[in-house]
């Protein structure tokens, strides 16, 4: 074998090894997450008990704001958990015993509120029909409710039934749209990134928890 051919094969083999590694490069965990880790673990234990996954809530906060406590979205969502003002006012009433005078800009309160809201949404996700509803799908539906409102999701699950697909399978429901294409694309991407990419990344970085979607 000539040295030129050997060199070409070596370059190709190195590319085949390195390319997948680059494609699956780890998520960069913001340094700011360390400032809030104790609070995340504290509220997850309070809201979920031993079955909670701090890594999941951390992943959601990462997606929402990148852990920036002064984050404000173009549409007006506020703080580390990105609550809209109307949602924040509703939560101040709904979770008054737990939150007191709720301020969405206060990261201590907002992290607690995010966990409470996730629990509230998850408890409202119910199976439709006779097919099983997995924990992964329940969480995906709850996350979609957090991001885009549970009303839209219920309409889309209804469209899924009308389309003779499984309204309890989050990936099948993704194919059906009741809202505009832009909001729908954002809404289906939201749980995918949190549950399939970010939660495993936080677990790999040492945060406690178990990935709900595998």
Descriptions of predicted regions:
Residues 1-9:
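N-terminal Sec-pathway targeting helices
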Residues 4, 21-38, 50, 89-116, ...:
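Non-catalytic cell-wall polysaccharide-engagement segments
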Residues 8-17:
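Bacterial N-terminal signal peptides
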Residues 44-54:
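Short, charged helix-capping/linker segments at alpha-helix termini
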Residues 52-56, 62, 75-78, 138-139:
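Extracytoplasmic
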Residues 59, 82, 142-144:
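Soluble periplasmic/extracytoplasmic beta-strand elements of cell-envelope proteins
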Residues 62-87, 149, 194:
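Cell-wall polysaccharide-cleaving catalytic domain and substrate-binding groove, primarily
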């Amino acid at each position: 074998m000539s040295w030129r051919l050997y060199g070409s094969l070596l370059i190709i083999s190195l590319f085949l090894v390195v390319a997948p590694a680059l494609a699956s490069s780890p998520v960069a965990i913001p340094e700011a997450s360390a400032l809030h880790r104790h609070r995340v673990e504290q509220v997850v234990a309070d809201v979920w008990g031993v079955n909670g996954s701090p890594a999941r809530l951390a992943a959601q906060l990462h997606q929402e704001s990148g852990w920036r406590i002064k984050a404000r979205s173009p549409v007006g969502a506020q703080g580390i958990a990105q609550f809209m003002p109307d949602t924040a006012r509703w939560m101040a009433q709904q979770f008054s015993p737990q939150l007191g005078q709720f301020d969405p800009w206060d990261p201590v309160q907002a992290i607690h509120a995010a966990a409470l809201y996730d629990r509230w949404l998850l408890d409202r996700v119910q199976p439709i029909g006779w097919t099983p509803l997995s924990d992964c799908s329940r969480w995906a539906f709850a996350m979609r409710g957090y991001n885009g409102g549970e009303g839209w999701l219920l309409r889309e699950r209804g469209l899924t039934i009308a389309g003779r697909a499984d309204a309890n399978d989050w990936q099948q429901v993704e194919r059906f749209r009741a809202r505009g294409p832009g909001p729908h694309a954002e809404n289906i991407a939201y749980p995918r990134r949190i549950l399939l990419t970010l939660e495993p990344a936080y677990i790999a970085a040492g945060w406690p928890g178990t990935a709900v979607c595998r």
